[in-house]
């Protein structure tokens, strides 16, 4: 398996100013080890030695996740500074409510991922993506992203959208195209903590309305054409889809207390803390599917999701069904 970058997701904090109803980043307020710089250094030094069987990579990327990691700006800066000094590529996932907080050090970040499920205020309130009744609007997000790009012209922008019972009818693809993002990841809500996921109908309805790669602007049309010509599975796609099966046991994740953890079961499975054992030993204590990991960064899973959607709506049985049309009941905003 040849991949350029291995990505490790460190959920450094559980604290968040939103209360998303489907959130899986719950650890019942465990001790967060990033409050101690020595622990942060131990974790990062441990991660530097990561090796995966039959997997070659040239770069390690630390993806800082929460909770909402941006809320504790100074502490976040200390982690980023330390990771940068150890030659990690650095990315971050945020709900976007305080993107301005990372402006002083965004030049050290290669990718900012923003979790956006809707641009409709009422929908976001129903989901729990609000703080004291305030939600982020499309125009606010656009302006914040433009400011970050001004400070770091090479910054990649990714949007993560979780398809759930409140937003499955919305058409977001045109707004995403207007933002000129580098990647749009569409994820299916995971069953977790006694909460059910969403039905095949709802997930496939969202895909039918939004899985339209042709609408997304490309940074480099020529390289995209050449990649598509030589290897269709590696073309420069912007939209990536992750169904529940693709999302399970395919991420390398660290909990706030420093343990590797893995999904795919009714409860998380954990390793011993990375402050106590090596990363190799920790990987032996959890299930991690390297093939799934690799496939998430290609578009195999996306093509499969598209095929399943077409099959679900019996589109392959009728030649006159056009995948390019939009359902009439989408978001009007």
From Swiss-Prot:
Catalytically driven reaction(s): GTP + AH2 + S-adenosyl-L-methionine = 3'-deoxy-3',4'-didehydro-GTP + 5'-deoxyadenosine + L-methionine + A + H2O + H(+)
Catalytic class of the enzyme: lyase
Entry EC no(s): 4.2.-.-
CDD domains documented for this protein: Radical_SAM
Residues spanning the signal sequence: none
Native organism: Fibrobacter sp. (strain UWH6)
GO terms classed as biological process: defense response to virus
Pfam families: Fer4_12, Radical_SAM
Binding site for [4Fe-4S] cluster: 16, 20, 23
Presence of the UniProt keyword Metal-binding in the record: yes
Protein name: S-adenosylmethionine-dependent nucleotide dehydratase
Cofactor or coenzyme needed: [4Fe-4S] cluster
Keywords from the UniProt entry: 4Fe-4S, Antiviral defense, Iron, Iron-sulfur, Lyase, Metal-binding, S-adenosyl-L-methionine
Sequence similarity: Belongs to the radical SAM superfamily. Viperin family.
Record function comment: Expression of pVip56 in E.coli (strain MG1655) confers resistance to phage P1; has no effect against T7. Catalyzes the conversion of guanosine triphosphate (GTP) to 3'-deoxy-3',4'-didehydro-GTP (ddhGTP), probably via a SAM-dependent radical mechanism. The modified nucleotide represses transcription from T7 RNA polymerase-directed genes (possibly by acting as chain terminators), strongly suggesting these nucleotides block viral polymerase transcription. How this protein allows bacteria to resist viruses that do not encode their own RNA polymerase (such as lambda, P1) is unknown.
A GO molecular-function annotation: 4 iron, 4 sulfur cluster binding
Domain Radical SAM core: 1-239
